[in-house]
């Protein structure tokens, strides 16, 4: 648990770095932030040059007199100091207040500040999220390398002083993402914290906690939040400094995806598709790590299928005949279709191409696992995944036997009985109810889906 002393050292570089902020340069260098000031803090663009540190001293006295009650005037004074001087002293106070309001319900923690006005609360959150990247980039600039990583000068005195505030910032952002219900505020937190990712990887434990918080937002909420969370996750994975962090990001993302496929219903299908399509992007970033993770997970699928065929117990069948397993097959077909796409390879085989054969073997085995007509929807799901792989990679997959067995089954060889049943939602069905067997409506739906699936 942190205490206020963690942020004390930031005062040490205040005097050396104080200078007037050139707003014209700010508008040119960071137009997005300048636009934010124009729209939300117009008064900060017109503060007088005669204002000096005496105002800050007055604020300190007010803080003591009011028992550190945070007011809008105090917050605006901090904003001015951050804009004019990139003031580490003002940054320290801002982060203390940020941490205090986010842990206000924790009676064990001694709070440096407290807030009574909801407007001040919102302003504090937005100010911290918006100003922190600006101040850090000024004091500890970074460079982006060709491989997508960030090079931060971690051997400087400034970083030695500011690395604890960075840790405090991310711990507060993590708490915000886990507890704040306002979607708009969460969206801002995701977008702004992404700008701080270059400084994140210096603390592995905090980086992992941040990834977990991102995955929580990626797997729930509205699409806008999901996409913003994934954008942060993508940058975090791409810029990871070591293989352990890359593996953690890939594994955690995959496990989060699979957990969210258990409840495959019409109203969840769109979200699952979004998660699969975005998670697929992570496996295009680091070739070696992606191959190792994909190899391990496809091997697990193969072992589950082998145990099912060998032991033939109900428990083993249930391991394979469930939505998470089918979504795993579909996800890896997405990954391999993307990483091994002929247009992407341009004559140079992808490092992932050797995984196509084992995935195809497992998929075909699952497709023929249960020959009963009730499981034809499962077979058609497998066929759809394999067709995607065929079209992208131009590999040969013997799908004809799977399709012919369906067409030669009793569902089509006998005249189907009429029924007043509603059409099945085959996208969210892998086993048809017994009432649909030998019915005209079921046969028509299967035939329609086979026709659509033909390349």
Report the location of each language-model feature.
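Charge-rich, low-complexity intrinsically disordered regions
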Residues: 1-269, 273-377, 381, 389-455
